[in-house]
Amino acid sequence: MQKGETNKKMSCYKPLIRIYSPEHREISGQVYSLARFSERVGKKLKYEDLMYEPKVMLIPCGQCIGCRIQQREDWTTRIELEARQWPKEQVWFITLTYDDDHVPGMILSTGEIMRKVQYVWKPGKKTPESVQTLLYTDVQKFLKRLRKTYESRLRFFCAGEYGEQTARPHYHMILYGWEPTDLKQLYKIHHNGYFTSETLCKIWGNGNVQIAQATPETYRYVAGYVTKKMYEIDGKKANAYYELGQQKPFACMSLKPGLGDAYYQEHKEEIWRQGYIQCTNGKQAQIPRYYEKMMEKENPERLWRIKQNRQKKAIEQKRLQFEGKDYKTQLETKERVTKKQTEKRGIL
């Protein structure tokens, strides 16, 4: 790979088509599916037909399984790059859980949110009378109290989800800017210590707090929960949460600026020159889409050239690998394989 080129691959299995025209800003940004774009030009097209079109670019759909896996990778990278801006002793992996006296839930007949709620089923009924639920305001209040107590600038990435076996709500968080003073070890796994803090438990006020030093593994763990839940809330899962009145699994994070922004501002030329992010574990990560959006604001022509080179190489490489199959067919085959793999593993 030459300097100035990106090694990012098209991870989307259902790419959309975007028109870019610097001299006609009113049509820049228009997006089409391959079928709709074929209708627009009046003939059936293949992705290969667009390879060398200077004003046409393939962009991720943001919804397919390939895009969701890439979103997990992007978040993992951004969480790590944010951590590089903080001392190690101020970056922690935290799990917030509820005790029986504080676990939130809903009475389905009234929609009332209450504490001390358990899942209650009546014989012969398809839905319970009451369910436990995530409560985003609990996270907001926790962070507000934490900032007030320590009078420090805090940043975070938080995923709210339900336990696999008990469906009990809890939260996983990467917390930046908090430096504990009263850690008490709970146990160790493979040399990694897990702690609690009386101060943090009081600030949380709803149950237990488990704390561990943040690592690349925990960054990926939290980001993985986000994408996993995004995938699970499609279809039947989405209907189940809706019917039960539960808050769907969610992610929330520090904004303005977004996570990893400071690293980008300090290293943007290096990032675009080398075309990848060098991670702590020795691996090279693709440049997050968040960074591409910032580049698009700063220098859209440069980003367009980078994406054009990436697109040509991706399609040409697939053409050589799978001679006789068009790019769309290859993507459909790859999507089926990826779905089977993720279903088998039970994760994204």
Where are these regions (language model features)?
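DNA replication initiation on ssDNA origins
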Residues: M1-E80
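Intrinsic-disorder/low-complexity loop/linker signature
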Residues: E5, H24, G29, V41-K43, ...
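Residue-level detector of short, conserved catalytic/binding motifs and their immediate flanks
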Residues: G62, W92, P169
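A structural signal for well-ordered alpha-helical segments within the folded catalytic domains
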Residues: G62, Y136-Q140, R220
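Residues in well-ordered beta-strands of folded domains
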Residues: I65, T95, F157-A159, Q210-A212, ...
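Signature for HUH/AEP ssDNA processing cores
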Residues: Q70-Q165
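Conserved His + Asp/Glu catalytic blocks
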Residues: E129, S152-R153, G163-P169, M173-N309
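C-terminal non-catalytic accessory extensions
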Residues: G207-Q210, R305-L348
